[in-house]
C-alpha cells in the first residue's frame, strides 16, 4: 500500500510560492479576518528603529473570533481544511448574520510566509486563554524535512509575563528542528 507524504517545502510552495506580491499576501490574510467576522482589519509596518529591532516588523491584526488551541491544531495547521466550505455555524450569542466566506481552499493562511522569515501568531477566542506560536519559515528551506517531522511549539498564556517566558521557551523548542537528523546539506537524501 502506498500513501502520500509531504515535504515541509510544500508549505512554502502553497504559500509564498503562490503569492504574486505583498498586496496579494495581505488580501489573503484579510480574507481570513473577514471570515472570522472581524469588524476591524489592521496593517502596520514598524521600521527597524522600533524598540531596538534589527529588522522591520509587519503587524496584521483583526478583531475576529480568534482561535482556541483546538482550532489552531485542527484548522490552522491542517492544510486544505473544509470548515468554511461546510458553513460552520456561528454562535447565536454573537448576534451576527452569516457572511459568505471569502476564503475557500484552506491555504490562504500560508501567504503569511511571503511577509517575512518569521511569524508570531497571537490569538484569543472569547472565554478562553490566549494562544501563541512562533514559526520561522526558513526551516522549510530544508528539502529533506517532512511536515510530520516539524515541531512548532504552541502555548497558552494569561499574562504578559507568562507570554514572554513561554515565548523564550518556544524559541528554544523550535530550534530542535535544526538538530534533527533530517537537517542535512542540500542535495543529500535521508
Where are these regions (language model features)?
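GHKL (Bergerat-fold) ATPase N-terminal catalytic module, capturing the glycine-rich phosphate-binding loop
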Residues: 1-190
